[in-house]
Amino acid sequence: MPKWKYLLIEIKKIEEKYGSSLRNPASDSEIIKMNHIVQQKLGNIIIPEPYIEFLKKVNGLDFNGLVMYGVDEDLLEKEIDEEIHGFIETNELWYENDWQKQYIFLGDSDTACYDTKEKVYVELDKPSGTLIQSFKSFDAMLSNALETII
């Protein structure tokens, strides 16, 4: 099991301690809808499979300054009580700057992305876009981000 899944269990315990909880997982049909709308609105983008695995565990995360984007609210089958930073709407904002289109934005505190040109996961400084570090896998990037906030 990837390290980030163990760290997510720790975050769940912290949330429960304060009477809160993690978000529900995204369903397969919500992810299919998201993929379809991504193709329409963002072009020929393939959402990284490890990120989809994350969404199937928890539909986004907003914890201690780290935000990981989830399936956009208007694509969800059930209404939710809290705001989700939607993957599509957030990437549309990032893509207003042409140079940022080489990235698939997955979350932020600093910005968690997939670099489609270099085929690596990266952490970019927010707002300058300066590369902070790169990771060979989504699992390594997410584990690093979660370790920082726990």
Residue ranges of model-derived segments:
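Segments surrounding the PLD/"HKD" phosphodiesterase catalytic module and close analogs
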Residues: 111-140
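A ubiquitous, low-specificity "background" feature that marks scattered single residues
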Residues: 76-78, 121, 143-145
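A surface-exposed partner-binding patch
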Residues: 1-112
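A short, charged
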Residues: 140-150
